[in-house]
């Protein structure tokens, strides 16, 4: 039945209002998301004012902080040329600089003196705290003579025999001695004994002696017998697992580290054939490995061969000096470093 005249039943709000509300809600959501998204592209200038930096726009790069200048100091080998005279192997009891005037050898004046501080028998010719028992051989005036020597205006060279050392090898066979494959001390072709370069205690023994010499004031330390034995039943030597050349290189590295606090030249004697051939596998010697770790290389050779040997040393390690070790009958070369033998 129809309703009363003039009235209609109420049907609620129209659908148009709902649509408007939905549109407004969507716009609010989109605006919020856009605001959040745009925060990623807001940057601030030096005054703190914000600005918009959109993708693809060339953003102003912040200038990098100025780096302080770094002065890189590279210490080059600066070994000067030396013309040295070697004194007799014995405890030094007196020092007289007049011995360097040349004597019977040459009309050239020597400017350096070499003194044996440890020989190939293991004898130590100074009051070394670290020497094995019975190795030290000194006289009453030795300490005073060494002090006077190193106080003089003369380049002083301490000769230190290294691994050929029967005294130290027998004093501590297990810790320092070179052994044979049977587990006993090795005897070379001259019935002598050696320290084992593979054993840290043997290397440390030599480094400690060298450091004592540096403390005495020597300007240069010349290492001799830096090798394995090359005579005798070499196939009976218990070399261990580390290559011989690596053991000797490790020794020279440790020696350099021990002497680093002191202003001292580190020198090594090599056989001349190691310089000409480049290596000696039996001895464990490599010219390159040795020359790169030393300031000066010494080798016994004729004066006429000195220049060629010096060139080969220089080629192996730029800046490493070469000194020829002469005989009593030799006339020293006019150029380069050399070492005269002890006067008889």
What function would you assign to each model-found segment?
Residues 1-17:
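N-terminal Lys/Arg-rich, disordered targeting/topogenic segments
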Residues 20-37:
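Hydrophobic membrane-insertion alpha-helices, especially the h-region
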Residues 68, 102, 119-161, 231-266:
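Aromatic-lined substrate-binding rim segments of carbohydrate-active enzymes
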Residues 155-164, 222-223, 245-283, 317-330:
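Aromatic-lined carbohydrate-recognition surfaces of secreted/lumenal glycan-active proteins
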Residues 73-92, 163-211:
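Active-site-adjacent "subsite" loops/lids of carbohydrate-active enzymes
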Residues 112, 138-186:
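Glycine-rich, aromatic-flanked loop segments that form ligand/cofactor-binding clefts
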Residues 98-124, 212-222, 288-298:
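Catalytic domains of carbohydrate-active enzymes, especially glycoside hydrolases
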Residues 37-43, 293-344:
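Substrate-binding cleft of secreted/luminal carbohydrate-active enzymes
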């Amino acid at each position: 039945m129809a309703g009363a005249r003039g009235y209609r039943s109420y049907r609620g709000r129209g659908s148009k209002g709902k649509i408007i509300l939905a549109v407004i809600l969507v716009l609010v959501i989109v605006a919020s998301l856009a605001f959040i998204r745009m925060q990623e592209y807001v940057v601030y200038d030096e005054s703190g004012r914000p600005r918009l930096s959109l993708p693809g726009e060339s953003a102003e790069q912040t200038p990098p902080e100025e780096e302080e200048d770094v002065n890189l100091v590279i210490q080059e080998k600066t070994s000067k040329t030396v013309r040295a005279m070697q004194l007799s192997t014995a405890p030094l009891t007196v020092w007289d600089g007049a011995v360097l005037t040349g004597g019977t050898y040459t009309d050239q004046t020597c400017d350096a003196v070499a003194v044996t501080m440890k020989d190939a028998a293991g004898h130590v010719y100074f009051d070394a705290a670290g020497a094995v028992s019975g190795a030290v051989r000194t006289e009453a005036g030795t300490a005073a003579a060494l002090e006077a020597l190193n106080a003089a205006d003369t380049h002083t060279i301490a000769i230190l025999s290294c691994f050929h050392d029967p005294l130290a090898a027998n004093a501590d066979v297990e810790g320092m001695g070179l052994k044979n494959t049977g587990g006993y001390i090795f005897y070379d072709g001259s019935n002598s004994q050696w320290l084992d370069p593979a054993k840290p205690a043997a290397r440390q023994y030599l480094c400690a002696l060298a450091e004592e010499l540096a403390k005495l004031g020597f300007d240069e330390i010349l290492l001799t017998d830096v090798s394995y034995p090359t005579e005798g039943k070499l196939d009976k030597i218990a070399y261990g697992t580390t290559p011989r050349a690596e053991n000797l290189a490790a020794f020279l590295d440790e020696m350099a580290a021990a002497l680093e606090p002191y202003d001292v030249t580190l020198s090594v004697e090599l056989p001349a054939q190691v310089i000409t051939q480049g290596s000696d596998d039996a001895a464990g010697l490599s010219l390159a490995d040795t020359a790169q770790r030393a300031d000066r290389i010494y080798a016994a050779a004729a004066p006429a061969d000195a220049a060629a040997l010096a060139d080969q040393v220089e080629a192996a390690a730029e800046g490493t000096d070469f000194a020829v070790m002469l005989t009593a009958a030799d006339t020293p070369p006019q150029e380069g470093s050399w070492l005269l033998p002890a006067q008889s």
